[in-house]
Regions:
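C-terminal "exit" segments of structured domains
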Residues: 178-192
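Short coil-to-beta-strand
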Residues: 9-19, 60-62, 70-75
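Von Willebrand factor
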Residues: 69-72, 77-117, 128, 152-165, ...
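VWA/integrin I-like adhesion module and closely mimicked acidic/polar interface patches used
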Residues: 87, 126-172, 177-178
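Alpha-helix termini
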Residues: 45-54, 106-114, 142-148
Length: 192
């Protein structure tokens, strides 16, 4: 039986966050180092924001190359901490499949009565192997919550290649960041 104080404790606000991370062959070497560094920095930023706002992080992470797979959480469950390290990069860049896997969580994302706008991070360094499939998956994400696009989509670019898919993915142009300059992400309104 809960004690008296637990009965009246206000539940924390949940903040659903999903990462879709490219580990294809083009990410080998220095780019994988940049990816790991960026995920560590993002973890610190998100945990700081959550602590300040008495927020419970609900984190999922999908790794993709030729196929997409869950690394943290899955369609049914989340983690409260982003703690991953990637050591291998191989295969092709199948972004569309990964985005569809992330979309499969969208109807489960907001089970809690109190939640912040879900955030979906896409981290990649190149165009996918099937751009049309990726653009279609992006359009499906934009409709994941019906007529209201409440999903905040943040694009993180590794390298200097212009990637039109990231422009189409991001909710707005100021939500496209280079992973070696994540300091600017602190100024983005992720807690909307």
């Amino acid at each position: 039986m809960p004690n008296f104080y637990e009965m009246f404790e206000t539940p924390k606000i949940h903040w659903p966050i999903t990462f879709v991370v490219d580990t294809s062959g083009s990410m080998a070497g220095q780019r994988l180092v940049q990816l790991n560094s960026a995920l560590h920095e993002l973890s610190n930023i998100l945990e700081s924001l959550a602590y300040q706002g008495d927020i419970q992080l609900s984190i999922r992470l999908i790794e993709f190359n030729t196929t997409a797979r869950w690394v943290l959480g899955d369609a049914e469950k989340c983690e409260d901490h982003l703690d991953v390290h990637f050591s291998e990069a191989s295969g092709l860049t199948n972004t569309g499949e990964a985005l569809r896997l992330a979309r499969s969580t969208m109807n489960r994302t907001c089970k809690s009565e109190r939640f912040l706008k879900p955030v979906l991070f896409l981290v990649t360094d190149v165009m996918s192997i099937d751009s049309q499939n990726t653009f279609d998956a992006i359009d499906e994400l934009k409709c994941a919550f019906g007529s209201h696009d409440i999903l905040l989509r943040v694009a993180l670019e590794i390298g200097d290649e212009w990637i039109p898919e990231l422009e189409a993915f991001a909710s707005q142009s100021d939500l496209i960041f280079k992973v070696d300059d994540l300091g600017h992400i602190k100024g983005a309104n992720l807690l909307s």
